[in-house]
Curated annotation (Swiss-Prot):
Positions carrying N-acetylmethionine: 1
Subcellular location: Nucleus; Cytoplasm, Cytosol
Posttranslational modification: Phosphorylated in M (mitotic) phase.
Domain SANT span(s) in chain numbering: 449-511, 549-604
Protein name, UniProt field: DnaJ homolog subfamily C member 2
A biological-process GO annotation: regulation of translational fidelity
Record InterPro entries: DnaJ_domain, DnaJ_domain_CS, Homeodomain-like_sf, J_dom_sf, Myb_dom, RAC_head, RAC_head_sf, SANT/Myb
Record note on domains: The ZRF1-UBD region specifically recognizes and binds H2AK119ub. The ZRF1-UBD region is also involved in protein-protein interactions with other proteins, suggesting that it may be masked by some regulator, thereby preventing its association with H2AK119ub.
Region listing for ZRF1-UBD, in residue ranges: 160-250
Role: Acts both as a chaperone in the cytosol and as a chromatin regulator in the nucleus. When cytosolic, acts as a molecular chaperone: component of the ribosome-associated complex (RAC), a complex involved in folding or maintaining nascent polypeptides in a folding-competent state. In the RAC complex, stimulates the ATPase activity of the ribosome-associated pool of Hsp70-type chaperones HSPA14 that bind to the nascent polypeptide chain.
Segments of this protein annotated with the region Disordered: 294-315, 426-453
Length: 621
C-alpha cells in the first residue's frame, strides 16, 4: 500500500477531489513467460535462482540434443520384426555410439527423427514398397522406442547389452602392465554398481587406505544387473494362472543362475587383479618388514629385560654372598671368641684345680696315714672333676685364708656334698633303668623276647650294633643278632625277632631314660678303665699335669671332623695324629687314635657278621 509523504513544517495537507467518472471492476488474466516461471516456482516450492539453474540445465540438454548426430544403421531395413527381441535397440534408433549414456530426451529425439524418415506413409508417398501390418521394418523402430523409453525395460536390455565385454583378463596378461589391463575393465564394470562414486583402481602411488577401500568395494560389489530380458517364456502369453506361475518360477530360477554366474565373474576379476596387483606385493613386503621390525624391537626389549633381570639377580647373589660372608665371619669371630673364653675357662679351672691339689698337698691332704692320704687324694680328684670354677675358687680361698682345721672341715663338707650328689644321681639312674627294663618287658610282651633277660652289656651291645648296621643293610636284623651272639658275654643266643622287639622297646623310651642308660654305660666304662689305686706301702708318685684321656662319648660332629681329618692327612703325613687332634677340638692325640682303632674293629666285626649271615643263607639254599 502506497502512502503520501507527510507535509513539511509550517505547511498543511489539502484534500482535493478530481471530477472523474465512476470506477468500473474488470478481470485481468496474467500471461507471459514470467508468469509461467512464477507458477512453476510456486508449485515446486523453489527459489528464482534454483529455477534459473534448472532452465540452464534444460537449455544445455536441448543444445546437446540439437548437437546429437544419429548413426545410420545399414541393416535396419533387413530386420525381421518378429525377431525384434534380438535386435540392437540403440542401433535401430541411431544411438549405437551413445548407448546406455543416452538421455530420455535423446531417445525421444532419435525416435522422432527415425519416424520422420522411415514412417510407412512417407515412404509410401515416395514410392517405396511397404509391407502390410507388423511385417514392415518400421515395427522394429517402434519396439526399440518402447523398450528404451520404459526405465524398467531399458535396464533389462542394458543388463544384456550385446556390445558389453564380459571378458576377465588372466593373470598372465596383466603380469607386466597391470594398470593398463585392469583399469578399463573395472571402469566398464562399474556401470553395474548400485552405489555411486565407485573407487578407481589408482596407480603405484596410491595409499594403502585407497587400495584397501578399492578391493573392499569390489569384494562386496552390489550389482543391479539382472537378466529378465533373456526370459525364454513370457508370462503374458500364459493361458491360465497355473501356467503363469510355472513360467515365473522357471524365469526366476534362470535369472538366479545367471546372476550367480555374473557374481562369480566379478569375483574372478577381483581375485585376478588382487593376485597381480604390484601394490599388494609392496604392501605385504612393507607389512612383513614392519612385523620383523616390531619382532626385533620386542626381542631387543625382552633381551634387555632379561639382561636387567640377570644383572639384578647377579647383584642379589653378590649381596647375598657378601651377607653370607659377613655372617660367616661373625660366626667365626663368635666361635673364636667362644673358644677363647672356653680356653680361658679351661685354664682357670685347670689353675684352680692345681691350686686345690697344691693346697691339699701343703696340708699333707689333712691325713696322718698313707691309706687316708690316698683316699683323700681320690676325693680331691673327685672334687676337681665335679666342682665348677666358682666353687673351686671359693674352696681355694677358704683353704688359703683359714687354718688347717677350718680348711679340713670345709674340704670334708664339700666332699660330703659331692658324694651325696653322686649317690642321689646313681639312685635315680638305677630307678630309671629298672623302670625302663619293666617298660621294655611290657612293650615286648608276646614278641618272643620276654623270657630272655637283657643285661646292661647286652643293651649297650644292641645299641652299638644298631648304629653299626644302619637301615638298608642286607638282612639287617639277622646281621645284628649274629653280631650280638658273637660279642655278647652273657651267652644268651638272640634271634632276629628278639632283636627287633628289644629295639622297638628302646625306641619308645623317653630321652631321660636313654640318657641314663648311656650314662650308666659310661660310668661302667670309666670304672673298668679307671686308674687302679696303688698299695698302701707304695710311695706316692708326684703328679704332673698332662693331657688326660677323655672318656666322653664321641658326638656326631666330632666323628665327622675325625673322618675329614683322616682324609686330609694321609698315612705318610709327618706328625699325622698331632694334626688330626688339632682338627678335632676337645680331643687329644690318644683319643683320636683310640677312636680310630674302635672304628676299625667295628668295620671288621660288621664284615664278619655280614659274611656269616651270607654263608648261612647259602647253606640253606
Amino acid at each position: 500500500m502506497l502512502l503520501l509523504p507527510s507535509a513539511a513544517d509550517g505547511q498543511g495537507t489539502a484534500i482535493t477531489h478530481a471530477l472523474t467518472s465512476a470506477s468500473t471492476l474488470c478481470q485481468v488474466e496474467p500471461v507471459g513467460r514470467w508468469f509461467e516461471a512464477f507458477v512453476k516456482r510456486r508449485n515446486r516450492n523453489a527459489s528464482a535462482s534454483f529455477q534459473e539453474l534448472e532452465d540452464k540445465k534444460e537449455l544445455s540438454e536441448e543444445s546437446e540434443d540439437e548437437e546429437l548426430q544419429l548413426e545410420e544403421f545399414p541393416m535396419l531395413k533387413t530386420l525381421d520384426p518378429k525377431d525384434w527381441k534380438n535386435q540392437d535397440h540403440y542401433a535401430v534408433l541411431g544411438l549405437g555410439h551413445v548407448r546406455y549414456k543416452a538421455t530420455q530426451r535423446q531417445i525421444k529425439a532419435a525416435h522422432k527423427a527415425m519416424v520422420l524418415k522411415h514412417h510407412p506413409d512417407k515412404r509410401k508417398a515416395a514410392g517405396e514398397p511397404i509391407k502390410e501390418g507388423d511385417n514392415d521394418y518400421f515395427t522394429c523402430i517402434t519396439k526399440a522406442y518402447e523398450m528404451l523409453s520404459d526405465p524398467v525395460k531399458r535396464r533389462a536390455f542394458n543388463s544384456v547389452d550385446p556390445t558389453f565385454d564380459n571378458s576377465v583378463p588372466s593373470k598372465s596378461e596383466a603380469k607386466d602392465n597391470f594398470f593398463e589391463v585392469f583399469s578399463p575393465v573395472f571402469e566398464r564394470n562399474s556401470r553395474w554398481s548400485n552405489k555411486k562414486n565407485v573407487p578407481k583402481l589408482g596407480d603405484m602411488n596410491s595409499s594403502f587406505e585407497d587400495v584397501d577401500a578399492f578391493y573392499s568395494f569390489w569384494y562386496n560389489f552390489d550389482s543391479w544387473r539382472e537378466f529378465s530380458y533373456l526370459d525364454e517364456e513370457e508370462k503374458e502369453k500364459a493361458e491360465c494362472r497355473d501356467e503363469r506361475r510355472w513360467i515365473e518360477k522357471q524365469n526366476r530360477a534362470t535369472r538366479a543362475q545367471r546372476k550367480k554366474e555374473e557374481m562369480n565373474r566379478i569375483r574372478t576379476l577381483v581375485d585376478n587383479a588382487y593376485s597381480c596387483d604390484p601394490r599388494i606385493k609392496k604392501f605385504k613386503e612393507e607389512e612383513k618388514a614392519k612385523k620383523e621390525a616390531e619382532k626385533k624391537a620386542k626381542a631387543d626389549a625382552k633381551r634387555k629385560e632379561q639382561e636387567a633381570k640377570e644383572k639384578q639377580r647377579q647383584a642379589e647373589l653378590e649381596a647375598a654372598r657378601l651377607a653370607k660372608e659377613k655372617e660367616e665371619e661373625e660366626v667365626r669371630q663368635q666361635a673364636l671368641l667362644a673358644k677363647k673364653e672356653k680356653d680361658i675357662q679351661k685354664k682357670a679351672i685347670k689353675k684352680e684345680r692345681q691350686k686345690l691339689r697344691n693346697l691339699c698337698k701343703t696340708w699333707n691332704h689333712f691325713s696322718d696315714s698313707e691309706a687316708e692320704r690316698v683316699k683323700m687324694m681320690e676325693e680331691v680328684e673327685k672334687l676337681c672333676d665335679r666342682l665348677e670354677l666358682s666353687s673351686l675358687q671359693c674352696l681355694n680361698e677358704t683353704l688359703t685364708s683359714s687354718t688347717k682345721e677350718v680348711g679340713k672341715a670345709a674340704l670334708e663338707k664339700q666332699i660330703e656334698e659331692i658324694n651325696e650328689q653322686i649317690r642321689k644321681e646313681k639312685e635315680e639312674a638305677e630307678a630309671r633303668m629298672r623302670q625302663a627294663s619293666k617298660n621294655a618287658e611290657k612293650s615286648a610282651g608276646g614278641g618272643g623276647n620276654g623270657s630272655k633277660h637283657w643285661s646292661e652289656d647286652d643293651l649297650q651291645l644292641l645299641i652299638k650294633a644298631v648304629n653299626l648296621f644302619p637301615a638298608g643293610t642286607n638282612s639287617r636284623w639277622e646281621v645284628i643278632a649274629n653280631y650280638m651272639n658273637i660279642h655278647s658275654s652273657s651267652g644268651v643266643k638272640r634271634t632276629a625277632k628278639d632283636v627287633i622287639g628289644k629295639a622297638k622297646s628302646l625306641q619308645k623310651l623317653d630321652p631321660h631314660q636313654k640318657d641314663d642308660i648311656n650314662k650308666k654305660a659310661f660310668d661302667k666304662f670309666k670304672k673298668e678303665h679307671g686308674v687302679v689305686p696303688q698299695a698302701d706301702n707304695a710311695t706316692p708318685s708326684e703328679r704332673f699335669e698332662g693331657p688326660c684321656t677323655d672318656f666322653t662319648p664321641w658326638t656326631t660332629e666330632e666323628q665327622k671332623l675325625l673322618e675329614q681329618a683322616l682324609k686330609t692327612y694321609p698315612v705318610n703325613t709327618p706328625e699325622r695324629w698331632e694334626k688330626i687332634a688339632e682338627a678335632v677340638p676337645g680331643r687329644t692325640k690318644k683319643d683320636c687314635m683310640k677312636r680310630y682303632k674302635e672304628l676299625v674293629e667295628m668295620v671288621k666285626a660288621k664284615k664278619a657278621a655280614q659274611e656269616q649271615v651270607l654263608n648261612a643263607s647259602r647253606g640253606k639254599k
